[in-house]
Amino acid sequence: MRSVELDDGLVEWRGALGFDRSDDGLAPRRLPDWTRSRIPDLFVESMVRMSSGVRLAFTTDSDTIELDAQLTAFRFEGQPPMHHGVDVVLDGAVVAQEQTEGAQRFILDPITRGVTGFEPAEPWRLRWTGLGTATKRVEVWLPTNATTEIRSVRIDDAATIAATRSGSPSWVHYGSSISHCMEVVHPTETWPALVARSSGLELTSVALAGQCHLDQFVARTIRDLAPDFISVKVGINVINLDSMRERVFTPALHGFVDTIRERCPDTPFVLISPIFCPVAEDHPGPTAPKPDGKVRVFERSEVLAFGSLTLRRVRTIISEFVAQRRANGDANLHYVDGLTLFDAPDWESGDLPDDLHPNPVGYARMAERFAPQFTAIR
């Protein structure tokens, strides 16, 4: 087997906008390098470094492919480790799905998110053989819920490898953990990946768990990418952290869209409101986990709650926001109600186990429901 250079253009890093480099390997980042100084804390940084939606793409006639990766993840005290998955796609078809618990892992306090411990782990070695010697388009989808430092990619000694340049339309999606999909083990099964693969789109995911707060450095990133299609699913994190009240939310949303529209004035752009969350429908945040893993909200006086946002109010604001801007001439701005993707009956069916995040079945249902709406808009 011979090693393939990771940064000489033969391997395309789709969905990666920057890299962390070490003597051992290359780890993709999902925001460009210039944003490093804008990132406010280590938890945001860890979400940027997670490889949700990132895949290695190349063309090869190698019968065998090997990959070594060092995974870095976290878990909260008292919780079991997550499983991490890698999927292999040949000529558009998923042919292999691997998973492991073997990541080096930081242990975090569930309230403060401070680091309380560390669990070491060896690199993960993966090998796929019997792939055939015909030339094929390969995509290796990396884990949704870990930083993935690629140490080595190897192919057969006599095999050839070349870059695979996609001619598919580009789609950038920004959202919260419900778009990041850390609960999904297999990376081709996040709802954005399912939509992208079924719709023939090249996905770049800047969905950052817990961190969808309309940050301008994300808006500038999307603007500068100038994709063919844009979607933003916003609202739940604003309530989770109680980071904005109504006075701030609407202007922040205008500013976010205005920044993107500077370079993408006519790009089809979808704003998606939050899916169902029982505790926050009519009660403002912040939210926090209970000992049983479900989320809760907190009672407070009317004075302190004045102007706070609930999910029901956020949906109304976003719907009215889109209607206003369309009336002012932005005909390519569209609204999708998050309740059309996941509503109370889906929660009642058990597919929102912590009352906040769908399980893989719930995410698949979201993809099935969003894809036709997205197609109609495009």
Where do the language-model regions lie?
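N-terminal secretory targeting modules
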Residues: 1-170, 291, 375-378
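A short helix->loop->beta-strand "cap" motif at the edges of active sites that frequently abuts
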Residues: 264-269
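Catalytic His-Asp segment of secreted/periplasmic serine-dependent ester chemistry enzymes
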Residues: 277-378
